[in-house]
């Protein structure tokens, strides 16, 4: 397990960044999850679940199934568990994507929100995700930091851990190499207006934030080969 990543995301958990990530990404996450076709009896894995907000959204769809969230940060997982006590169809585990502690062909759907670019060995992680999926199952990932969304490139120098800046074509190729088919890429827009008095540490200016919003989040999905 990547100790540098675990340490950093444990710090994020203590700083409340799991909850701020929900505030920032939930409008896009809701749209992405709605497009996945999760059924009431689906078996779903949320990779890089953080504080578990997307896991709980998925659990609302798979209310007669099961949703498992994993994260490399034990402190994020603890917060996810504490926030999900009302959900009987949810569980969480501390694990990294490159070595998933699950059986082959276990899940009908896999979701990942804002985590792919942190993986040290993304090809291995994608192959592991493919391994644990049932044939014909859907994997959908959302990322904001990608080559075509230039405004997000400024994040790279502010992060304490290395990240992978990839293009849409890069992601498509990696999905294909991992065994996925029927690859789709689409943009999802956050419908909230940008405040006139926007100030934040995420972007250097309001103009940068507007450009980021206009470019949209990248959702890339693929089906596990039958």
Describe the role of every protein-language-model region.
Residues 163-179:
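Short alpha-helix
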Residues 137-143:
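Conserved beta-strand signature within the Rossmann-like core of class I S-adenosyl-L-methionine
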Residues 144-162:
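Short, glycine-/aromatic-enriched active-site segment of Class I SAM-dependent methyltransferases
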Residues 123-135:
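A short glycine-rich, Lys/Arg-flanked "PGG" loop and its adjoining helix->strand segment in the class I
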Residues 1-39, 53-57, 76-79, 83, ...:
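Conserved class I S-adenosyl-L-methionine
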Residues 111:
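A conserved beta-strand element that flanks and buttresses the S-adenosyl-L-methionine
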Residues 43-99:
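Class I SAM-dependent methyltransferase SAM/SAH-binding core
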Residues 197-226:
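Core SAM-dependent methyltransferase catalytic element
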